[in-house]
Amino acid sequence: FDEKGYIYDLSDLKCIRNLSKDALIQSTYDGKVFSLPLSYTCFGFVWNVDMLKQYDLAVPENREEFLNVCETLKENGILPYGANKDFGLTVPVMCAGLYDVYQGEGTEQKLQELSEGTTPVSEYMRKGFDFLQMMIDKGYMDPEKALDTIPSSDGEKEFFAQENCAFICAIYRGKTFEGYPFEIEMTPLPLLENGSICVVGADQRLAINPNAKHLEAAITVVEALGQTEILDAFAQNLGKISSSKNATAPAIPQSDSIIACVVKGSQIPNQDFRLHFNVWDTVRDLSQMLCQGHSPAEVSKEYDSRQMKEISMYGKHG
């Protein structure tokens, strides 16, 4: 779209300064701000808190606690994780694989090396695929059940509501918190040695066609909608997170920890336009292959191959 001249660069609009750093990253391609995200969302784990309490467990806050919770539940005959075939695989694999890129030192440098292909993506993502394999090997999730489960479906919700598993992966929105006969809590993914991380995404974008007849009017509308108080109110009405620097969210006590994580920033974007290859869809496809019996080594090698192929197609040629 950029090369064809369909993208109007919003960088000079005053309202762009109102966006949170993570929302801005998700709206920037090759130095151009191509859209105004009207709201923002995130993916996290939703826990059956009552079930954990039955076994004297608390909602985990780091990797060690997470593995202990999973092992204790499994020993008591409970399937810990009710994964689905889509983001229920993608989100934990991305969190376990890419946290180093976004939360370590030198994020921009790492992204550039990945984007140029000087660093193979498997250098990070192998850890993510190994994590998924570990979950399968230890019986913390059922790969066949996962491949049969559609995300955000009634079937997935019923499976969790009937206490067939202890936690699922969900997208943050008002509906996520409704309809359970037990206490729930939505948290970031406690997969790091020293804490948690989540995947975030800009939602409902506004963009401007530079060839529009009424360009000035379109710019005026975007400026008006991009005011902090408008973004905050819009997100509140939708039951989502504001894309403003405030990152306000509806007052849902069960989501305090995941909102705090989003506000902190440096989370993993579901789409990072600084990378000249796909992450979200590819990680989903390769995670499904892993659930079908392919090894972490095989899917990592396949990802490296796709990375190089896509860079040669979409990367910048100097």
Set out the residue ranges of the language-model regions:
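Short helices/loops that flank or line small-molecule/ion binding pockets
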Residues: 52, 68-76, 151-168, 292
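Long, aromatic- and glycine/proline-rich binding clefts that accommodate carbohydrate-like moieties
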Residues: 184-187, 235-289, 312-318
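Extracytoplasmic/periplasmic solute-binding protein
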Residues: 34-36, 43, 67-117
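A ligand-binding cleft/hinge motif common to bilobed small-molecule-binding domains
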Residues: 1-2, 170-183
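Glycine-centered hinge/linker elements that transmit conformational signals in sensory
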Residues: 72, 114-146
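Short, solvent-exposed loop/beta-turn-alpha elements that line the ligand-binding surface or hinge
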Residues: 9-19, 101-127, 191-199
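Hinge/lid segment of periplasmic solute-binding proteins
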Residues: 1-43, 58, 67, 187
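Extracytoplasmic/periplasmic substrate-recognition and gating elements
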Residues: 32-33, 55, 178-240
